[in-house]
Amino acid sequence: MFYSFCKVGQYMTYFKFELIHRSKKSRARVGRIHTPHGIIDTPNFVAVGTNGTVKALNNTMLHDIGLQLMFCNTYHMMLQPGTDIVRQAGGLHSFIQRKLPIITDSGGFQVFSLAYGSVADELKSRGTKKQGGCVLKITEEGVLFRSYRDGSKVLLTPESSIKAQKDLGADIIIPFDELPPYHIARDALKKSLDRTHRWEKRSLEAHLKNPQEQAMYAVVHGGIDPDLRKESCAILTELPFDGFAVGGSMGKTKDEMHTLLSLTLPLLPEDKPNHLLGIGDLPSIERSVPLGIDTFDSSYPTRAARHGILLTKQGPLNITKSEYATNFNSIEKGCLCPACHHFSLAYIHHLFKARELTCMSLATVHNLYFMVQLMEKYRKQIQEDLI
Amino acid sequence: MFYSFCKVGQYMTYFKFELIHRSKKSRARVGRIHTPHGIIDTPNFVAVGTNGTVKALNNTMLHDIGLQLMFCNTYHMMLQPGTDIVRQAGGLHSFIQRKLPIITDSGGFQVFSLAYGSVADELKSRGTKKQGGCVLKITEEGVLFRSYRDGSKVLLTPESSIKAQKDLGADIIIPFDELPPYHIARDALKKSLDRTHRWEKRSLEAHLKNPQEQAMYAVVHGGIDPDLRKESCAILTELPFDGFAVGGSMGKTKDEMHTLLSLTLPLLPEDKPNHLLGIGDLPSIERSVPLGIDTFDSSYPTRAARHGILLTKQGPLNITKSEYATNFNSIEKGCLCPACHHFSLAYIHHLFKARELTCMSLATVHNLYFMVQLMEKYRKQIQEDLI
């Protein structure tokens, strides 16, 4: 069992990573992340609850299906309701009534992706400035942007991001970083990376002044440049972070991502947990678990659910197809989720056709339970050295 | 205890109305309606689940809060998924997985309200033909209308409505009736009433050929004309219906409705349950319980919930108001609903502001639980002769 450092020589008791098994077949590993709000078995899937709820569910439902880690977005919580209010409520766990672990990001990703658009937007030339939010100025200090909610100017810096994340009080927090656009010259990428490292260091320093029983994961950047990725690992692993997230652009294809992760993961310390930011579609998880990724967050299963895509062991099915109108079986035989336990494909198909909100929660709870089960299966297979 | 007749001399064992207490102070009464899917304590509120679900909830949640009767709309179920499919699923209870009693209407109300608009639409001159559905022809046979879903022509007759309701298999069904517009000359109203009586009789005959453990409530019509209301009661109470619903236009104001109900209720048999169709706002319930109404259906509490109106003992509150942003109490102190048990006003306010679907289900489950509790309070007060 490895204990993470808070400061040199000072053992943390509230956060540790326990390595249970390392596969003989790959770099895949099974572990346990101990947090103030309980254990996260790894590898695991992290549900995205941007505004403090997974869309269409409530947090007691998440608890009941055993979803161990939930991702909330600091950017959104800053703008609504404001992190002050969450602090007054006693922190995010109390405000949203979640008893299990939470991770928050720095807000940087959202600010920059609103400015540049997502990588996918960029590749598809869908333009920028979604939702009307925009970056006004990037300086060494931080980023000045306009709130998409009320048009007010907001300055986000490493210190203000950490202040916000202290208000939120998640178990795992993320330093402030820059998300450079996918199409960027190497010089500009290098400059961005250097600044990100300075911002992450400032974030860590701000955090360590008041650890508040939170753990901080660094975010490895460097885009699709292998040398810069290596440099990022080298610099960040020198700092007393509690874990390491992999962020930034990872290329256009799953092959590119696989290559980058294969290069990056071995450069991260084995005794600390790692996280793959914003990627959690099924093929990516399948290819990344053998590389040693511990946790994945993604809105894929929940967003897919709201569009009628239900995950099953036989692959995703589109519940809106007419073939399900008279299928009175459950989504997946043997599935113990509340949707499968009570309702048929035909009924859920009907709810989608009738545009009833109820279908969203049934589909979402099924897909998340599927992810919980899938990750449990991966852990079992790793322990049996099958992965 | 009164037993309803199925045919003369043939006692029904699957449906009966049990009168528990008649108030000494008013015509209010406490009773129990026994159905194949359990008891409905009266007076009670009936939740509207148009498409086989209360919007934003699932049927296990309804069960858990003790909602004893749910109203599904035959018109909607005919067009989507089609009552054939529901029959194949084993009926509505099986299809939507509801273990407690269900009532369905005839489809007539929707067909005509799509043609004429609702009374409220009419009074506000909002015009007709909402959603693009329209009545093509009304004959003695029935109504030919165009489906708002696919533009196909559908003929709804007393016999086809009952056929559909046999497919659905609710505990309580409603004969096919005409909903005349509010602004109608007396002659036309009288003609409509006569036809409605013929249609209701045909519906009853169709039903009694195959009772299928269903009970049928007549629908008293006559609009705002006291003499026609009396005539309707006289004619319908001669027929072996199992209960009596009051339908049609009941005037522009609550006073008009009160006058009409005061006149109508004493003309209905005491040994059978009655129902007030489509009216269940709080002031109307408060004024109608003393008149002896047993059940009320209304989409008010659920629709209000989706607009952020939460019902409390101190009156409705608008959760979207900024005063709730930092109110960390539950919606109502002591309320045992899932929303109050877990979440604060501030969090639900936040979910509304962030436009999260989750707020809809929390608000809806609270409002319905409020109605369950309210009706229980009324029953208690009647038993103590306070109403």
Swiss-Prot record, chains A, B:
PANTHER family for this protein: PTHR43468, TRNA-GUANOSINE(34) QUEUINE TRANSGLYCOSYLASE
Provide the reaction this enzyme catalyses: 7-aminomethyl-7-carbaguanine + guanosine(34) in tRNA = 7-aminomethyl-7-carbaguanosine(34) in tRNA + guanine
Give the protein name, as stated in the record. Answer: Queuine tRNA-ribosyltransferase
Native source organism of the sequence? Protochlamydia amoebophila (strain UWE25)
BP terms from Gene Ontology: queuosine biosynthetic process; tRNA-guanine transglycosylation
Q: Which residues form the active site?
A: D105, D297
Cofactor(s) demanded: Zn(2+)
Q: What is its EC number?
A: 2.4.2.29
SUPFAM superfamilies hit by this protein:
tRNA-guanine transglycosylase (SSF51713)
The task this protein performs is described as: Catalyzes the base-exchange of a guanine (G) residue with the queuine precursor 7-aminomethyl-7-deazaguanine (PreQ1) at position 34 (anticodon wobble position) in tRNAs with GU(N) anticodons (tRNA-Asp, -Asn, -His and -Tyr). Catalysis occurs through a double-displacement mechanism. The nucleophile active site attacks the C1' of nucleotide 34 to detach the guanine base from the RNA, forming a covalent enzyme-RNA intermediate. The proton acceptor active site deprotonates the incoming PreQ1, allowing a nucleophilic attack on the C1' of the ribose to form the product.
Does the keyword section mention Zinc? yes
